[in-house]
Curated annotation (Swiss-Prot):
Gene3D superfamilies linked: 3.30.420.100
A GO CC term assigned to this protein in UniProt: cytosolic large ribosomal subunit
Domain of life of the organism encoding this protein: Bacteria
Protein known as: Large ribosomal subunit protein uL18
Keywords: Ribonucleoprotein, Ribosomal protein, RNA-binding, rRNA-binding
One Pfam short name: Ribosomal_L18p
Native source organism of the sequence: Limosilactobacillus reuteri (strain DSM 20016)
Amino acid sequence: MISKPDKNKIRQRRHLRVRGKISGTAERPRLSVYRSNKNIYAQLIDDVKGVTLASASTNDSEVSGKTKTEQASGVGALIAKRANEKNITEVVFDRGGYLYHGRVQALAEAARENGLKF
C-alpha cells in the first residue's frame, strides 16, 4: 500500500530549505514561529551568536483570547512589545515552514500593527 506522507516531516524539510536562505543578526533578528496543535510560540533569535533575544507564547499569562487565532494575535502583540523594550524594530520573518495563513498570519499581522517591520 502507498502510505501517506508525514506532514510534519515535509514541513521540517521546507523549513530547512528556507533557513538556508535567511538568518538573523542582533540588529535585525529572526522572528521564528512554531505552531503546535494547542499553542503557538514566537522567538526573536540572533543567529550570529545563537541567542534568543525575546520570546512569547500562548502559555504566557498576558495572552488571552477565545480562539487559537485570537491567541496568536496576542502572541504577535506581546513579541512586538518585548522587541520594542529591547529597541528592536526590524526583524526577518521565519514562518517555520507553515503556510502564511490562519494563526501564523494573525501573529505576523499583530506584530506589524504593534511596531515590528518585516
